[in-house]
Regions:
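Catalytic binding pocket for nucleotide-activated donors in carbohydrate/polymer assembly enzymes
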Residues: 7-11, 21-24, 38-46, 50-57, ...
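Conserved catalytic-core segment of nucleotide-activated headgroup transferases in glycan assembly
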Residues: 171-254, 264
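Short hydrophobic/aromatic-enriched beta-strand-loop microsegments
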Residues: 161-168
């Protein structure tokens, strides 16, 4: 089956936290025989910050971020059996969704893949005239990056036919333990781009914790933090490319995860960095959110903090031996329950079941039409 996938970027994680997620799922679907083309705009300087070159398991079409070129790639949706429009492309999102769904063949499966479902739901509720309201019923399904039961209920209440979370996971071929790298040596490392709806929580869980532990080393990676006030024990290293994530996660005594406001409110939304860090056998400290235990067991496979004071207390008491043990357990858990091979199997089964249902419906309708013709 051919898939036309319209998203932010497959080849660059620069200001694009969904890159690892896209790569893991699409790579596994390709292994299962899907023929996939990923369409991404040349926007936000991502192409000059590529983490990977176009892979052999997916065709990548990069188009200029103009309405004319967007319309050209939209027309190619007609070639696919499954058409996927992801959220957060960042350029002509509404026009892109309308265009690819209109261009899709009548027998094609139409999917909206929401990689920021809490924000999308909030926007739809705030704007009753949002164009997506009219389009939801025309979609065959909504797949989401996370969100669990609250997001499923929200989407179905807004008119979606089907909604299913496909959670982040680990690609063990990409993320795994490596030898420590001294440039990433620290007691607590945090890797994330600076975003408005996460900044307050970063201040609390990371910067506040650093102020409470002036004798400990804190390491901050990610784009946008240059002018953020930091205590003297916080070292900022800028954007960290995907190829260095394993060393970052394998070197720090502990690695912090901080959810965005919307994700923390909804819950059931582990970020890619959680599985990247677990894959490198890192000891993860996360802010508290509903559903953590569905992915890693608190206290044994991950440490959970309610605020910066909790983070500081956990780091102050954490020994290298305990950190290593928590990391080993986290790695074993994600290898057992949370790999992209398992997520790919979920998506594959969903696609096949849906298409079988559609074919059965077409046969029934054809049979009824034939019977009416005889009468």
């Amino acid at each position: 089956m051919k898939i036309a996938f319209y998203g932010s970027s497959l080849v660059s994680s620069y200001w694009n936290g969904a890159a690892t997620y896209y790569r893991g799922i699409i790579r596994d679907l390709a292994r299962r025989g899907y023929d996939i083309t990923f369409y991404e705009p040349d926007a936000y300087d991502r192409q000059s910050h590529r983490d990977i070159e176009p892979p052999d398991w997916c065709r990548v079409v990069v188009y200029p971020a103009t309405i004319e070129h967007m319309k050209r790639v939209v027309a190619r949706a007609a070639e696919a059996d499954i058409v996927v429009k992801a959220s957060g492309v960042g350029v002509f999102d509404n026009e892109l969704l309308d265009g690819v769904m209109a261009a899709a063949r009548p027998d094609a499966m139409r999917i909206f893949w929401d990689v920021d479902a809490p924000a999308t739901i909030a926007e739809l509720r705030e704007h009753p005239d949002h164009p997506m309201h009219a389009g939801l019923a025309d979609l065959d399904a909504v797949l989401t990056y996370g969100g669990g039961p609250p997001i499923v209920a929200a989407y179905e209440s807004l008119g979606a036919r089907h909604c299913r979370p496909i959670y982040n996971a680990l690609d063990p071929d990409t993320h795994h333990p490596v030898a420590p790298d001294e440039k990433f040596r620290c007691d607590l490392g945090f890797l994330a781009n600076r975003l408005p709806d996460r900044e307050r929580r970063v201040e609390e869980f990371f910067l506040n914790a650093a102020e409470q532990l002036p004798d400990r080393a804190f390491l901050l990676g990610g784009a946008g933090w240059e002018d953020k006030p930091k205590s003297s024990n916080v070292r900022y290293i800028g954007h960290v490319p995907t190829r260095d994530h394993n060393a970052f996660n394998s070197t720090a005594l502990a690695v912090l995860n901080v959810a965005r406001d919307s994700m923390a409110t909804i819950g059931y939304s582990p970020a890619t960095r959680v599985f990247e860090a677990a894959g490198a056998a890192a000891c993860i400290v996360t802010d508290a959110w509903e559903g953590v235990g569905l992915f890693l067991e608190p206290g044994k496979e991950i440490l959970v903090a309610r605020d910066g004071r909790d983070v500081a207390a956990l780091i102050a008491e954490l020994t290298p031996h305990r950190a290593a043990e928590i990391g080993r357990r986290a790695l074993a858990r994600v290898l057992r329950d949370h790999t992209y091979a398992q997520r790919g199997a979920e998506v594959d089964a969903f696609f096949r079941k849906f298409r079988e249902r559609g074919q059965m419906r077409e046969r029934r309708e054809a049979g009824r039409a034939g019977a009416e013709g005889v009468l």
